[in-house]
């Protein structure tokens, strides 16, 4: 199986579905309360961000998922930086509704996406990327067993702003 193949991943806590325009209303509701989160990839316009991620998917560079909990889309996560000639991938552009943060949803989603990458797609390393200032996300990444690999300054974000990333890897 390839990292770019559409797939549904599911466990008792969360379901990861291929992102589609059908998720727009739920995701627009889910982003409420995240206006403060300047350091993460919460989109200003959910429909525009879905369109952007689907264009990246169609170009073979990204495989975006809607994170679904209790029947509603509550966030997004993505395989990105896909290079089918390299046995590694990045997981990023993740954001979750405040109502599911610090619940089992994020950990369950990350375990699904990591398991799929390592087991079904046979990658040897996964990079999880977050903003340096996003301490909550960095702590969650560490709980998954990933270790921080350094700090990258002046990286362009999807919002076309420069940011400082704290990449971590699990292999």
Named regions from a protein language model:
Residues 25, 138-139:
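Alpha-helical elements of the RecA-like P-loop NTPase motor core of helicases
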């Amino acid at each position: 199986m390839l990292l770019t193949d559409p797939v549904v991943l599911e466990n008792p806590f969360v379901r990861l579905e291929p992102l589609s325009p059908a998720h727009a209303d739920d995701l627009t509701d889910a982003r409420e309360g995240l206006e403060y989160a300047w350091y993460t990839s919460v989109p200003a316009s959910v429909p525009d961000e879905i369109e952007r991620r689907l264009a990246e998917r169609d170009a073979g560079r990204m495989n975006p998922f809607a994170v679904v909990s209790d029947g509603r889309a509550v966030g997004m996560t993505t395989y990105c930086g896909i290079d089918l000639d390299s046995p590694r991938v990045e997981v990023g552009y993740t954001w979750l509704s405040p109502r599911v943060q610090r619940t089992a949803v994020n950990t369950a989603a990350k375990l699904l996406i990591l398991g799929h990458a390592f087991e079904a797609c046979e990658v040897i390393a996964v990079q999880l990327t977050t903003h340096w200032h996003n301490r909550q996300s960095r702590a969650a990444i560490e709980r998954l067993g990933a270790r921080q690999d350094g700090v990258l300054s002046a990286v362009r974000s999807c919002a076309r702003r420069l940011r400082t990333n704290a990449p971590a890897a699990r292999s």
